Amino acid sequence: MDDAAVLKRRGYLLGINLGEGSYAKVKSAYSERLKFNVAIKIIDRKKAPADFLEKFLPREIEILAMLNHCSIIKTYEIFETSHGKVYIVMELAVQGDLLELIKTRGALHEDEARKKFHQLSLAIKYCHDLDVVHRDLKCDNLLLDKDFNIKLSDFSFSKRCLRDDSGRMALSKTFCGSPAYAAPEVLQGIPYQPKVYDIWSLGVILYIMVCGSMPYDDSNIKKMLRIQKEHRVNFPRSKHLTGECKDLIYHMLQPDVNRRLHIDEILSHCWMQPKARGSPSVAINKEGESSRGTEPLWTPEPGSDKKSATKLEPEGEAQPQAQPETKPEGTAMQMSRQSEILGFPSKPSTMETEEGPPQQPPETRAQ
């Protein structure tokens, strides 16, 4: 029985193809029960590799079934046939993904970026509070609903964090995600704290939101890793970013895992607080008292002529992305997209930039 017949018996009218790989595909469909369109990921067990079937797929199914958050793509139903096909019925994001938006419109204004990044951060806090880690956070996994709200998707690399007898989080060893979003400890192949890894990826995402470019050029991983470990972050002067925004990014892109921000510290950072038009940035502490953010303002070094990293804005001719993605092929929707998405220039573009760190001690965390 083909997919259309199987799904029709379950009340779904199959629509167009959204993505396809060697053993998985994603299609749109109309749900007769829900009375609206959905996305259905179809996985063929007969074609999938053993590692995916034994490790990644069971984790994804378990985690999707437990998640329920307004900024995470909703899973409506998961079922399997006797012919070895797994069907995952999900919310359909009608406005595409964040990277498509940035590719079309360019960098986001800080106010718009703040709203979207706050939605994403709340989704990550929800996951981390459940001891669930994503491990593949990137702009093309951030889908957009009809109102352009963030919907976190693709939990193919997600897992439940294990704890030892003393309650300490077990380290992960699997290289997950895309090199451009990967933390230095992951790129080095050493055991890593998965929640802390997610934070680094959040830093890359916020940089892309407000700069319209990648913070690091991943065409040379060895060179990129050296720059990351030196804690160098360049910001385009042309974007006129606020000090608070640059400071938050700088602290998320902290190579020292013991000093990188936690998700609660991100949410309490002064840049994340609602800004009254024309008034200075104010952070609200847990007691409800307003105070200046404890993060020092990011101050650019004068005369910097550093080059920017990979440019994402639709201003120049795109160049091919050389670095392949490491995601299992079972995630068909995102599988073939990385070369397209990073088909923006993957060599550094010449533009005036500012380079961190802040001139004041940078490691003070927001309280």
Curated annotation (Swiss-Prot):
Tissues where the protein occurs: Testis-specific. Present in sperm (at protein level).
Presence of the UniProt keyword Cytoplasm in the record: yes
PROSITE patterns referenced in this protein's UniProt entry, alphabetically: PROTEIN_KINASE_ATP, PROTEIN_KINASE_DOM, PROTEIN_KINASE_ST
Record localization: Cytoplasm; Cytoplasmic vesicle, Secretory vesicle, Acrosome; Cell projection, Cilium, Flagellum
InterPro entries noted in UniProt: Kinase-like_dom_sf, Prot_kinase_dom, Protein_kinase_ATP_BS, Ser/Thr_kinase_AS
EC assignment: 2.7.11.1
Binding site for ATP: 18-26, 41
Regulation: Kinase activity is specifically inhibited by 2 classes of compounds: biphenyl compounds (1,1'-(biphenyl-4,4'-diyl)bis(2,2-dihydroxyethanone)) and 1,2,7-trialky-1H-imidazo[4,5-g]quinoxalin-6-one. Activated by phosphorylation on Thr-174 and potentially by autophosphorylation.
Ranges of Basic and acidic residues composition bias in the record: 303-314
Entry PTM: Autophosphorylated.
Highest taxon above the source species: Eukaryota
First-listed, main subcellular location of the protein, grouped into a coarse class: cytoplasm
Active site per database record: 136
GO cellular component: acrosomal vesicle; motile cilium
Keyword Ubl conjugation: yes
Keywords from the UniProt entry: ATP-binding, Cell projection, Cilium, Cytoplasm, Cytoplasmic vesicle, Developmental protein, Differentiation, Flagellum, Kinase, Magnesium, Metal-binding, Nucleotide-binding, Phosphoprotein, Serine/threonine-protein kinase, Spermatogenesis, Transferase, Ubl conjugation
Cofactor entry: Mg(2+)
Note: TSSK1B might be used as a target for male contraception or and intra-vaginal spermicides.
Function, in words: Testis-specific serine/threonine-protein kinase required during spermatid development. Phosphorylates 'Ser-288' of TSKS. Involved in the late stages of spermatogenesis, during the reconstruction of the cytoplasm. During spermatogenesis, required for the transformation of a ring-shaped structure around the base of the flagellum originating from the chromatoid body.
Family: Belongs to the protein kinase superfamily. CAMK Ser/Thr protein kinase family.
Assembly and binders: Interacts with TSSK2. Interacts with HSP90; this interaction stabilizes TSSK1.
Protein name: Testis-specific serine/threonine-protein kinase 1
Name of the gene this protein is made from: TSSK1B
